[in-house]
């Protein structure tokens, strides 16, 4: 199997996006296609969550400039939202030139709409000025929304 075919097979397994984005190269791809070199910021592609007893393991997969970024986190099942957010943040770590941790991640009800909310803490600032907040509507999958809320919190810091 050549490198291009091997890469496409990996993307086919890793992506929750339609396979039409992967097959056939870059012809007709839109500028926001996460698998092209033109993607300006990391794009969420998939999140995997496995629960074993009282433990949860999350793996986040993002794409940027045609490259795949993967991050993971394992922890207590009671902290599932924070584990998913931490896995997403772990995938982004190579792109960050500052220290950041997940302060909290949760699903809130906003006038009848479920919203994923992530609060990230930069550096060791505990005054609140080092906080980044991101949100995303839950559109079916809570884990997807949590991952997108982390990207939302870091959006301005990751933009070019």
Label the predicted regions.
Residues 97-105:
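Hydrophobic beta-strand-centered segment that forms part of the acyl-chain substrate-binding groove
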Residues 55, 79, 83, 141, ...:
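Conserved active-site and cofactor/substrate-binding residues in soluble primary-metabolism enzymes
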Residues 18-53, 57:
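Non-catalytic linker/capping segments at the edges of enzyme domains
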Residues 56-63, 108-136:
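Positively charged, aromatic-enriched nucleic acid-contacting surfaces
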Residues 84-96, 150:
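Active-site helix/loop of acyl-thioester processing domains in fatty-acid/polyketide metabolism
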Residues 1-28, 63-69:
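Intrinsically disordered, low-complexity regions
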Residues 127-160:
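Mixed-charge, glycine-accented linear interaction segment located at domain edges/termini
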Residues 71-78, 132-136:
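Beta-strand/loop nucleic-acid-binding surfaces
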